[in-house]
Amino acid sequence: PTYHDGQLSPVVGVHNIQLVRANREHPDPSNGNGWTYNHQPMLAYWSGQFYYQYLADPSDEHVPPSQTFLMTSKDGYQWTNPEIVFPPYKVPDGYTKESRPGMQAKDLIAIMHQRVGFYVSKSGRLITMGNYGVALDKKDDPNDGNGIGRVVREIKKDGSFGPIYFIYYNHRFNEKNTDYPYFKKSKDREFVKACQEILDNPLYMMQWVEEADREDPIIPLKKGYKAFNCYTLPDGRIASLWKHALTSISEDGGYTWEQPVLRAKGFVNSNAKIWGQRLSDGTYATVYNPSEFRWPLAISLSKDGLEYTTLNLVHGEITPMRYGGNYKSYGPQYPRGIQEGNGIPADGDLWVSYSVNKEDMWISRIPVPVELNASAHANDDFSKSKAISELTDWNIYSPVWAPVSLDGQWLKLQDKDPFDYAKVERKIPASKELNVSFDLQAGQNDKGTLQIEFLDENGIACSRLELTQDGVFRAKGGSRFANMMKYEAGKTYHVEAVLSTADRNIQVYVDGKRVGLRMFYAPVASIERIAFRTGIPRTFPTVDTPADQTYDLPGAGEQEPMAEYRIANVKTSSADKDASSAFLKYKDFSHYADYFNGMEDENIVQAIPNAKASEWMEDNIPLFECPQRNFEEMYYYRWWSLRKHIKETPVGYGMTEFLVQRSYSDKYNLIACAIGHHIYESRWLRDPKYLDQIIHTWYRGNDGGPMK
């Protein structure tokens, strides 16, 4: 958490799209009319479009009034304005709680708090739901089982809503003292059936536990665990997740759960939601904050839904919190995807909703299958793409006021947000010697900033190029910058960068002319992505920042003059030894050589010592991967040991059968019966000199005569 991205490598092609940017100074329908506490989104896909529900308060969590908004989208990128689906609800005067002695409700509005937002019925009806709780003061809990009740209404295909009904009453409330009727009073029989399906579904009741009456018999597991979600395992059992990475399994569809409920080993998660989902390709993913803070937002993958083996980045940006407030937390948080039964998007990808700083609403699209590494270098002609959604090799960060879009042949980054920026990243195969080229155009040269960074797998930038607001194209070197040239607004430049991790430098060419040579300002082992960003890096908040921000930032709702940048024809290539390798990289298998080197003392050293074994293997051997690790280990051990038998002789390389001297070998300790085996194995080595010289030694080593 020292770094906002956790120094995690992103999965390939994640698109982070902001739906709502809170704005108290300039309220309008696009920002929920100025309410600045926005949080806890829910997601469904039904009848060919996305449905996104979230709750809102004017400024503070648990401080009324409160309401629930709904947005829709055909493609996940363009969204309707928030529409009130559950309006503010008045708490009856005189309402009391045992936990708040001496306090009574007077002209009080309820607080909405729900952990589930949608249900698609067996007959295909879409039901949305919310819950009215009560907070008598800002430190009271609206999810303490002492609320008013849970409400439902139908969302129809034409976008209209049905009437609001209560589906569940908390103690002390019923149809006589509430403002909406009980669902069974509806004359729509299919709607009534849909509501009854919800009540009969234990997996939905598990998501009601926080707001429901304590010890209510309809709740299968009456524990204080929060933010339940679940998915189906390959054998039909149900795996569950709660805050703090608590887990359990049900073998009967959710009616009973294994006890005790335990923390998932290896998962780091604090008091924040964790989302788990079975993906369209049959694998599993969890999306959560892997720290004691609510950043970064990461994804972990599993083949069976039980053992998770990876951790990569989804959203690693934290904007300044523009509006302080009660219980507002920094970071991308409370992720929730599409619950089983609530639809599968047309693209089959993983879509995850969440809030940032509990004020801005976001969604992420994660391509499925989830790719952790780029399989090929960039050769990107944006004119071949019709929509931004087609750029599945690019990671996109697109706020409302700093959008990323396509414009013909150009990938366009705009920015009028003083607190945020547009950002795109192209992940590439990790390269030590890298060539990058692209066309670049700035819409202005008197405002705005565009930074271009070259980063390793941990997000460490080794070098940065920058278009400044003063019309200068410069390169960062340590704490200083080197001005390379002036740039003009509207002019297209062809930029080439040649980077070497061995030499620790970057050479920059513009329109074929070298304009700069700078040392890296941070050493890296390799480069795996190129980033274009319309702003400077952010480091606030830190791990030492106080949890509660009580102030608003000056100008929180104001805009800056629009700056615009365009990039096109992005190409990368590598001069690395394994640059032509599409999938397997030696670094993923180098640990075998390290392990073998440590197994025993090296008492006999020939042409290639153990200290050079890994380097030699990287240069020469074909790579192999298989699920059975002992097979894989044996494969690399064979190459490691073959290398030990390569021997330098006065007539060239030879290959011994035994390391120790044998009485029946020739003068170089070679044995003729093994030559066929040596040739058969050595023909796979990339450098032909070994095989050529081994054969030459046998056939010409004694001037063509028999070896002695």
Language model features with spans:
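Asp-box/BNR beta-propeller blade signature and adjacent active/binding-site loops
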Residues: 1-376
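Extracellular glycan-recognition surfaces and repeat-rich motifs
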Residues: 386-412
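Flexible glycan-contacting loops in extracellular carbohydrate-active proteins
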Residues: 518-565
